[in-house]
Amino acid sequence: MIRIGSNLIKQSIKNTNKSGISRFFTTGSNNSTNYKPESCVKEEPKGKSVNVEDLKDQEIIALVDKGEIQPHNLETRLPNNFQRAVHIRRKLLARDLQKEHQRALHAQAVVAAAEKAATSGEDPSSIQPVVPPTSNLDFEGSLTNLPVDHFDYTKVLGACCENVIGYIPIPVGVAGPILLDGKLVSIPMATTEGCLVASTHRGAKAITKSGGAKTVLLQSGMTRAPVCRLPSSIRAGELKQWIENQENFYQVASAFNSTSRFARLKSIKVVIAGRLVYLRFKSSTGDAMGMNMVSKGVEKALEVITEYFPEMEVLSLSGNVCTDKKPSSINWLEGRGKSVVAEAVISGDIVRDVLKTTVEALVSLNIDKNLIGSAMAGSIGGFNAHASNIVTALYIATGQDPAQNVESSNCITLMESINGGKDLYISVTMPSIEVGTVGGGTHLPAQSACLDLLKIRGANLERPGANSEQLARVVAAAVLSGELSLMSALAAGHLVRSHLKHNRKTEAPAPQADTISMTHNLPHSD
């Protein structure tokens, strides 16, 4: 009997695939079975094309169903109304969700009927699976809380996102201002983690009251490392020697630099594994983060190298020695993007009155937690308390690639007692901050506003690269603030209490103090 039930299910699925609605399908209304989307499209006169923008939404949906318009191409077919294209795509999604829900209910009903036949001994064909009506389910309404209006989608197409159905509003807070290199700077942070902005603000306040933070840019250069294959390791070694010849490097650099006004090749590091060769190109990129710019230059450079090594196979433009969006020792040791150090001296009075702890406690905890603890965990570039928290919040606010927080959050936090143990010296060293003030999401209105807040939107025409360098300095200073504040909270035992205040819904009563464990409600990175 179980076999019969299984056959019943298979036949139902077969019928569903044929017609979209199984012959076993029963609902409160069968009007949907008579609907044919293509019936709402007027017959197109011969020799005359239809302007899609003149059609009604349902007529456009019918063309999608017929395969004449691809859902991801709605914006190109509605070039004067991208917002309408997004609305139509939402309707398509809601309808598809409705259909899938109906199919799921039908499958459940078929299984229930088969099980009933198996246990009762009845003839399976005499049992009609009954599916409850789904007309009361509003899948389009379920998208109501995903905003769609009041957004300029012309800035998204071909740049930021595909198959757009709306956008996500994220709260943006401001920390500071912090006195950075002699100027007051406010720090925009987009986050959903309560206490993060407040904590960073406290750190910025302590730094500013103590005379401010200073930064130094150690190096700047985006990297891309294609992987190539030679016939043998001997030829791979010869390629390495060829590239390391200064005259040959200049020839490759000339080809690389010809692809952009801003790209200037600085170095090529050659890494060999057997007969595989990884060529890590490093280039300046102006005010752009520069991944696309460097990739374009690499393609041109490889053409020159191939002239001298025609047997070389380029397996991939990226061979993971770059390294992008993945933890790696090479970024930690040699840098990628901007390498920045931010430092400050915090007076003992500020440590006591603002941070509510002591210099001795901070220095000791930093060694035990950020240095020894991270070493015991085998961390690569993670010798800090929560650098990625601040990096990600700043990246989202300013239109950076949030996924690059992986390498951009590489950071070692150091603390020392100075002036006879009276004051605190703190620094963060961040070798791979990947940022830009042009390209990516930096041109979106909200993100542009945050860059305006920092006075670094767009390209710096007087000194190309200056704006992106300043953004990297701001990132480092913000991380310095966040590290100082969180480490102080941990040293003073305030972490749980601060999160209970800032990281809970206001309508929810706070738990009694004696029921809170010390591990409850810790931040995502502590």
UniProtKB/Swiss-Prot annotation:
InterPro entries: HMG_CoA_Rdtase (IPR002202), HMG_CoA_Rdtase_cat_sf (IPR023074), HMG_CoA_Rdtase_CS (IPR023076), HMG_CoA_Rdtase_eu_arc (IPR004554), HMG_CoA_Rdtase_N (IPR023282), HMG_CoA_Rdtase_NAD(P)-bd_sf (IPR009023), HMG_CoA_Rdtase_sub-bd_dom_sf (IPR009029). Keywords: Cholesterol biosynthesis, Cholesterol metabolism, Lipid biosynthesis, Lipid metabolism, NADP, Oxidoreductase, Steroid biosynthesis, Steroid metabolism, Sterol biosynthesis, Sterol metabolism. Pathway: Metabolic intermediate biosynthesis; (R)-mevalonate biosynthesis; (R)-mevalonate from acetyl-CoA: step 3/3. The active site is at E193, K325, D401, H499. CDD domains: HMG-CoA_reductase_classI. One of its GO terms (cellular component) is peroxisomal membrane. One of its GO terms (biological process) is isoprenoid biosynthetic process. Residues 514-526 have a biased composition (Polar residues). This transmembrane glycoprotein is involved in the control of cholesterol biosynthesis. It is the rate-limiting enzyme of the sterol biosynthesis. This is 3-hydroxy-3-methylglutaryl-coenzyme A reductase 2. It comes from Dictyostelium discoideum. The gene is hmgB.
